[in-house]
Amino acid sequence: MRITGVVQAGGLSTRMGGEPKALIELGGRRIVEWVVAAIAPVVDDVLVVTNTPERYAFLGLPMVGDVFPDHGSLGGIYSGLKAATGEAAFTVACDMPFLRADVARIVLAHAGEADVVIPRVGEQLETMHALYSKACLPHMEAKLRAQRLKIVGFFDQVRVLEIPEDEVRRLADPAVVFMNVNTPDELARARELERSHGR
């Protein structure tokens, strides 16, 4: 199965004072560069969902805008999946600096077994570290047109395979590998992790 890696870079970064969080430098590279470096080895191609392509041109990757602007993360996931050259899209956020290829492989190993393959950590489904098949598109579109934007809102209409937390934990601390940098406090924590653990 051909799988496209999709980096979601459509957020407004309002909690970071408007500075695009993906472009913040951490450990000598911009966060989005760490994201691409983590997923590129395990997918067939990578694209970026963004409404500001000029900011991400330096990556040299295909870029697509939101099909449904201002429809939140579900709109971004839909746009990336629709544009994906593969039969499925491995979707990640642009602000996850500690993503790891080996953790991604746990998800991708189950490609073809379900329409959504997604890790669960406690009560949280990691919707921005998940594999979505093209079979999800009509169900996503119906929710988007109805303005029902909760990502998991269409899950009861497709086959979902959850990856147990302990599978992730065998390789990495889920609190680190799935960490988002949404706020200045989270950025400070990421810098501390970078200093203490390196790569």
PLM regions with names:
Residues 155, 183:
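A residue-level signal for conserved active-site and pocket-lining positions in enzyme catalytic cores
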Residues 1-148, 156-175, 188, 192-198:
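Nucleotide and nucleotide-moiety/phosphate-recognizing core
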